[in-house]
UniProtKB/Swiss-Prot annotation:
<dbReference type="GO" id="GO:0005829">
    <property type="term" value="C:cytosol"/>
</dbReference>
<dbReference type="GO" id="GO:0006053">
    <property type="term" value="P:N-acetylmannosamine catabolic process"/>
</dbReference>
<dbReference type="GO" id="GO:0047465">
    <property type="term" value="F:N-acylglucosamine-6-phosphate 2-epimerase activity"/>
</dbReference>
<dbReference type="InterPro" id="IPR013785">
    <property type="entry name" value="Aldolase_TIM"/>
</dbReference>
<dbReference type="GO" id="GO:0019262">
    <property type="term" value="P:N-acetylneuraminate catabolic process"/>
</dbReference>
<comment type="pathway">
    <text>Amino-sugar metabolism; N-acetylneuraminate degradation; D-fructose 6-phosphate from N-acetylneuraminate: step 3/5.</text>
</comment>
<comment type="function">
    <text>Converts N-acetylmannosamine-6-phosphate (ManNAc-6-P) to N-acetylglucosamine-6-phosphate (GlcNAc-6-P).</text>
</comment>
<dbReference type="InterPro" id="IPR007260">
    <property type="entry name" value="NanE"/>
</dbReference>
<dbReference type="InterPro" id="IPR011060">
    <property type="entry name" value="RibuloseP-bd_barrel"/>
</dbReference>
<protein>
    <recommendedName>
        <fullName>Putative N-acetylmannosamine-6-phosphate 2-epimerase</fullName>
        <ecNumber>5.1.3.9</ecNumber>
    </recommendedName>
</protein>
<dbReference type="GO" id="GO:0005975">
    <property type="term" value="P:carbohydrate metabolic process"/>
</dbReference>
<keyword id="KW-0119">Carbohydrate metabolism</keyword>
<keyword id="KW-0413">Isomerase</keyword>
<dbReference type="Pfam" id="PF04131">
    <property type="entry name" value="NanE"/>
</dbReference>
<comment type="similarity">
    <text>Belongs to the NanE family.</text>
</comment>
Length: 235
């Protein structure tokens, strides 16, 4: 029988997220965004918050990668940072839970190893995705028993600031694929169909695209920037 990860091999995952300061922030809107993604051929949805996931699951039957973004004092870790978020997510049964698996200090000084152990003890069947930013973190995630690893946070930590996944023909992605045997999820700044296809060609198991599909304000900004640059060139 195929597992969720088997089903996602070579496919597109669409991230449907809008934070409180964004114009599309609404469980209803995110559920419709997920429906549009499903109709377009997406194989799964990545979503933030219990209310959004519940609404999305009413609209589509696709697997969901669930997260909860929540800030904690004294820690830069905010993606599914503690067991509290895991407990909340499990009330809506996402097929996969993604969490920050970087080496940064976690809330309450907890180690990643301890956190994973808590999750496995309480919810032994849930699939776990490690959101990482470095090669060492990818290797550690595999050692800790994560089911898959994503390049989600590359360029978003102090150690990797200034970098982005597409640079040098996705060099970081290629390095991660070579370093681990668990499925690698390409995620982060995959902003064109060609880049998504390239990630898969380079060995990614599956690819997540978010803002380039589901954040109209970002898409509009890119168009405006290109038009303004063209206008300057012609001036």
């Amino acid at each position: 029988m195929k597992t969720v990860l088997d089903v996602l091999k070579g496919k597109l995952i669409v991230s449907c997220q809008a934070l409180e300061n964004e114009p599309l922030h609404s469980p209803f809107i995110m559920s419709r965004m997920a429906l549009a993604a499903a109709q377009g051929g997406a194989a799964a949805i990545r979503a933030n918050s219990v209310v959004d996931i519940a609404a999305i699951k009413q609209q589509v039957s696709l697997p969901v990668i669930g997260i909860i973004k929540r800030d904690y004092p004294g820690s830069e870790v905010f993606i599914t940072a503690t067991l509290k978020e895991i407990d909340e997510l499990m009330t809506v049964n996402p097929e996969i839970i993604a969490l920050d698996a970087t080496a940064r200090p976690r809330p309450n000084g907890q180690t990643l190893e301890s956190f994973v152990g808590q999750i496995r003890a309480r919810y032994p069947s849930v699939l776990l995705m490690a959101d990482i930013a470095t090669l060492a973190e990818a290797k550690e995630a595999q050692a800790l028993g994560f089911d898959c690893v994503g390049t989600t946070l590359y360029g978003y930590t102090a150690e990797t600031q200034g970098h982005s996944l597409p640079e040098n023909d996705c060099e970081f992605l290629r390095d991660v694929v070579a370093a681990v045997s668990i499925p690698v999820v390409a995620e982060g700044n995959v902003d064109t169909p060609e880049r998504a296809a390239r990630c898969l060609a380079l060995g990614a198991h599956t690819v997540v695209v978010g803002g380039a599909i589901t954040r109209p304000q970002q898409i509009t900004t890119r168009f405006v920037a290109a038009i303004e640059a063209h206008s300057i060139d012609r001036a």
